[in-house]
Amino acid sequence: MDNRKVRIGIDVGGTFTDAVVVDNETYEVIAKEKVPTTHHAERGVAQGIIEAINTVLTKNGISPDNVIFIAHGTTQATNALLEGDVARVGIVGMGSGMEAERSRKETTVGNIELAPGKYLYTEHEFIDAASLTDEAVKEAIDALKLKNVEVIVASESYSVDNPENEQKVIGLAVKEGLVATGGHEISQLYGLQARTRTAAVNAALIPKMMETANMTENAVKDSGIKKPLMIMRCDGGVMSIDEVRKRPILTMLSGLAAGVAGALMYEKLTDGIFLEAGGTSTDISAIKDGKVMIKNAQIGGRKLYLTSLDVRTLGIAGGSMIVVRGGKIADVGPRSAHIAEKEYEVFTDTDKMKNPKIELIAPREDDTSDYAVVACANGESYALTLAGAANILGYVPADDYAAGNVESAKIAWGALASMTGSTVEELCRQAMDIAMTKVGEIVKQLIADYNLNPNLICLVGGGGSASVVVPYLGEKMGIRHKIAENAPYISTIGVSLALVREQMERNVANPTDEDIRKIRHDIMEVITRAGADAATVDISIEIDSQKNILRAIATGATELRTKDRNAKTISEEEQKQILADAEKTTTDMVERAAAAG
């Protein structure tokens, strides 16, 4: 192979770990590999990562020296929170004078519900900051150690202005052999309770994430790649693995961010809705003016000082099963063939479809018994799915990832047609209409929330089931649509192309030029520490006058780029087509009115 420089993206999923190699100059996808995710290996998922890297490099003759960027997306932080697999946290609250009692109350955050029945357990000690001696701090830390805490959080009112006391607690805790962090390291916003809560969630993730980060980093080094490993963030950017060790909370929900990054960087979507459809669910997000839309994250219904992409997930996808009640289709999903442990009818050999008969089952013990499967002479039963309906109706191209055995699907749906007295096509359209009405409602919400123009946006589909969802949805809603190139790997591609990103917020009423200069300086320090080349960094400043928030958003690449690979030249014919589509007309009705340059 030639010596072109490449970027590697790795996406660690529940079942498979995907790896892609992308040409650094052209964005061409050079290679793709899929290996089983190694949850139970001695090195955990890191073992699957090294297998994916070695396979993709060896098979394609790529030298590790030619890899100039490597990053991976992880669901570990999200999974740890959902499963309650987190460390017990000790909080050292501080305050003085009239603020002392309020500070004591606001740093006592209690046990934080992470998911139904799963909690982050916190212990609390309070010190009057007016007498913050080393002895007082050590006494508080020792008391917390007796309560079996693994991590210390130091939290004080106004530490965003002066973090000295928090830094003292952190330093003494580290000397005691504990991992420690402070509220000022997580957020620059006032609001002691929310800052403490966010710091506690972050701290609870640190021990587990440090262990995984070390194994993953060593795995990458073992492959011979010299560039530092970057990790996907929840806002669509990446950060260095050293920063992950300090702020693992920023990787929470990052699994949803990778696909959006792919739509933004690879598909160059500037205004539209991105839908990443898998087997069980579809993740839906908005992109406006070439920017991802973000929101404040929550845990247990309480706000965190953490921004993540506004990604809305719906239990409709290629594997969604068909619900039958009263002799007709009543619903689609949320259960999928995967959850029911059934094969898709459309991915089944025709010779298995002998003597088909519809049966109604409960995919899980607590589900209703109205999900349709087709039982066959071989003793097996197969799920009727949305993918089957889309294939039968001709919405899935023959070379698509979701393309299947249409003949088998027609046999299965034919059994349902016999039971309901409808035709196969009528049933398939009923199922698609029910499903796409649900998806369409979320698309409409995003269009309204972000003031997008339906005539100018495009629906872009990614994921293995993109062609099952997006073409029918676009047709139904009258909105332009397309399937992303390499759609099944769009998340992994997004990881490989993502920029380093940092965001900083401060409470400032009527910010002065000096306030803006200071936040620009500070975020530049943070983003370069996170791995960005200073020469590539772009900083935007936002002022929220209603909330008195001064916000800086910085993005940058890990290497100096010789050209803007995101720059896209649109021909006059393409411009005419875009305008014609927006105005629901043809290109021969569009004329150039003026030109410049």
Locations of regions flagged by a protein language model:
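N-terminally biased helix-coil "hinge/interface" segments that flank
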Residues: D2-G597
